């Protein structure tokens, strides 16, 4: 069972599936809940988020496996967003998901169970890094904070350069083809360190994602020479 990432679809696995099938596996790659033409949930910013709880996504994975007449799968493979769902599948139902492969996004493990909350109620704490990023000489914001804002969805769907060119620039900016990509470990979770990340991760505070990646749009010659994500793929 192959679970795709964001912003992707099951189509992302089209080059992987034949190789696995040739090895003798029945390969299944669904569009995950909230992606593609899936239904039964609200895309409205104020919509109910309960349908997207992880256990519901695990149930979706199990439902797909069972729908194809299998009681278990050899492996559940998750990439990016799918790498969040896949380990929970394996943890929740190891009898169904016999092994797990996690790609791109590391699994942080199961959260600690709150203890002695009757005497010491848990308090919601704010991560100061967002405030610190905004206070930098060059004000910044974390991309996940931006994605959680009301305007983000419309910003990307209505990108001035068009959705196709937005995604072309977005993927180019994140790929090894972008010459300024230089992966290296940060010294800590601080605004000063996070500001060293490329702008697709830590954006300028007053820019949308469409504006951010437009600055890194590859040339027509670069696009024509691209073999990782060609337009005719």
Annotate the PLM regions.
Residues 1-43, 64-66, 79-84, 92:
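Conserved HGGG/HGGXW glycine-rich cap/lid loop of the alpha/beta-hydrolase fold
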Residues 35-77, 83-233:
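Flexible "cap/lid" subdomain of the alpha/beta-hydrolase fold that forms the substrate-access gate
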């Amino acid at each position: 069972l192959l679970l795709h990432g964001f912003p992707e679809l099951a189509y992302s696995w089209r080059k992987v599936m034949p190789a696995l099938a040739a090895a003798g596996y029945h390969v299944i790659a669904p569009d995950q809940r909230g992606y593609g033409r899936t239904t039964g949930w609200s895309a409205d910013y104020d919509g109910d988020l309960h349908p997207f709880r992880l256990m519901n996504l695990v149930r979706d994975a199990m439902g797909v496996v069972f729908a194809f007449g299998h009681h278990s799968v050899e492996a559940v493979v998750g990439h990016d967003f799918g790498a969040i769902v896949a380990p929970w599948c394996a943890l929740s139902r190891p009898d169904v998901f016999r092994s797990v492969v996690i790609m791109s996004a590391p699994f942080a493990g199961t959260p600690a169970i709150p203890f002695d909350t009757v005497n010491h109620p848990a308090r919601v704490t704010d991560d100061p890094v967002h405030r610190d990023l905004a206070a930098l000489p060059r004000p910044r914001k974390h991309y996940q904070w931006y994605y959680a804002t009301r305007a983000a969805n419309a910003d990307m769907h209505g990108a001035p350069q068009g959705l196709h060119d937005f995604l072309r620039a977005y993927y180019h900016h994140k790929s090894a083809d972008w010459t300024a990509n230089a992966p290296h470990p940060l010294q800590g979770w601080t605004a000063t360190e996070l500001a060293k990340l490329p702008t697709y991760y830590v954006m300028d505070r007053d820019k949308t994602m469409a504006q951010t990646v437009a600055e890194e749009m590859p040339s027509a010659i670069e696009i024509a020479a691209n073999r990782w994500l060609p337009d005719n793929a």
